[in-house]
Regions:
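Catalytic histidine neighborhood in serine/cysteine hydrolases
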Residues: 225-244
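Short beta-strand/loop motif that positions the catalytic acidic residue
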Residues: 204, 210-212, 216
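Short beta-strand element of the alpha/beta-hydrolase
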Residues: 23-31
């Protein structure tokens, strides 16, 4: 589904359905260097269960026109504008990694318009190492390899996939390669710079689910406590053997937890 927001073409995946304002609505927000396609399995499930699903492409990602937004705050403002353009009075928000920071900022501003929040692979602050920032700016191939390597648990890097016929590591590499280099670099710098996450978390009253892999090396488990402590109505679910790429490492567990939290 294409729509115009701020005079730019914006793409949102809706499972080929028109948004029905009488139904509950679920907004999926992707992580750095990715697009709406990471949410296809989950969006289709909730669409079949009478939810509006809006898996967005942030500006400069996927099928949405640029320019790329350079801060989490700007991405949250854009997301709110999109929600308002669609005429949605209330929404549930699901975000992965950078998308979880956008979820925090968006939910803190929308208040009781947010019915539920889900933070997947989330910590705050979310620092990015200098070697990764150097690679995203100057050596995109190396950046893709680094982020893919660290994005999976060590056991999942060895092979195997819950989706038959797919190789999750190669799939991640192809997704990075399909996006503009400038988008990944800008996204990483936005994550590194965002410092309002704990304050935003303290302002959120909606029931919140944190989903985390116990083998996450990009946003390690030991760093989740400050965020969890600042959320007033939250629970944590830990996925054994999973790294940062939870939606492909254990999609069934993620879907089951989304259903428990949202349905």
């Amino acid at each position: 589904m294409k729509l115009v927001s701020s005079e730019k073409d914006t793409y949102v995946y809706t499972n080929n359905k028109t948004v029905d304002r009488t139904k509950p609505s679920l907004v999926f927000i992707h992580g750095a260097g990715f697009d709406h396609s990471v949410w296809t399995l989950f969006a289709r499930h909730f669409s079949r269960h009478d939810w509006n699903v809006i898996a967005l492409d942030l500006p400069g990602h996927g099928r949405s026109e640029g320019p790329v937004l350079e801060s989490i705050e700007a991405m949250a403002s854009w997301t709110i504008e999109l929600i308002d353009t669609l005429g949605l009075n209330s929404v549930a928000l699901v975000g992965h990694s950078m998308g979880s920071l956008i979820t925090l900022e968006t939910a803190s501003r929308l208040g009781d318009r947010v019915t539920h929040a889900v933070l997947i692979g989330s910590i705050s602050p979310m620092p990015v190492s200098d070697p990764i920032l150097d690679a995203t700016a100057n050596k995109p191939g190396a950046a893709h390899s680094m982020l893919t390597s660290f994005g999976f648990s060590k056991q999942n890097l060895m092979g195997g996939n819950p989706n038959p016929g797919m190789w999750m590591v190669s799939d991640s590499m192809r997704r990075y390669e399909d996006e503009a280099q400038s988008a990944l670099d800008s996204d990483m710098r936005a994550c590194n710079a965002y410092q309002r996450g704990l304050e935003a978390a303290s302002e959120i009253t909606a029931p919140t689910l944190m989903l985390h892999g116990d083998a996450d090396r990009l946003t390690p488990m030991r760093a989740t406590k400050p965020l969890l402590d600042n959320l007033s109505n939250a629970r944590m679910d830990i996925i054994p053997g999973a790294g940062h790429s939870l939606m492909v490492e254990d999609p069934n567990h993620v879907l089951d937890q989304l259903k428990i939290h949202l349905l």
